[in-house]
Amino acid sequence: MTASERVVVKELSSSLLDMKFMLKKKKQIETKAAKKKEAKLDQLITEKEAEATCSTEILKSSEPKLEICYDYAKLENLKFGRLSFGGFNKEVELLMEYYEKLQNGMLSDSDDDGMDVDDEEMAKSLGGQKLAALDKKSQSKRERRQQNERNEETTGGRRFNIKDIRKRFAADDVADAPERKFMKPAEDC
C-alpha cells in the first residue's frame, strides 16, 4: 500500500471494544495511548529543562506571591478586626476606641487585670438570693420546718402562687371602684 491508498481509520467505539473478542485490541490501544502521553510529558520536561539551563535570568513567575510567617512581630501594628462607622454597631465602636487607646498608649494592659467583671458586679450577681439558697441547703429539717411555719403565719396559712396574687390585686381594684348595679330602663308613657 502506498501513502495515497492508505485509509484513515477512526477509533473503534467503546461499546465495540467492550465485547469479549475485542478485549485484546482494547488493551493494545490503551497501552499505545499511555505511551504517547508519556512521550509528550517527557518531551515537555526536556524542553523546560533546556530553557531553564540556557537562560541566565531569573523568572519572575518563580517568586512566591504568598509569604508564610509564623512570627507575631510583623503583626504588631494591626488594627482591631471589626469595624463600625456612624453608630451602626455601638458595641463594636466602643471596642474600636478601646483598642485604639490601648495601641496609642493611653491605656495600659495592667488596668484590665484580666477581669471581665468588676468586683461590685460580681457581688451583686452572687448576692442575696444565691446566698439564701446556699443557706437553705445547709439547714436541718427542723430549721426548714420552722421557717415554713413562720412564712405560713405571715400569709395566713395559705401558700400563694402567681395566679392567687393576680386575683388578689384584681379584687382590690374592684373593691376601690364604685359598685355597679343594673339599672332598669326608664318607662316612657
Swiss-Prot record:
Annotated TM spans: none
Ranges of biased composition (kind: Basic and acidic residues): 133-161
GO biological-process terms attached to the record: maturation of 5.8S rRNA
Region (Disordered): 124-161
InterPro entries found in the cross-reference section: MPP6 (IPR019324)
Family indicated by similarity: Belongs to the MPP6 family.
The protein's name: Protein F29A7.6
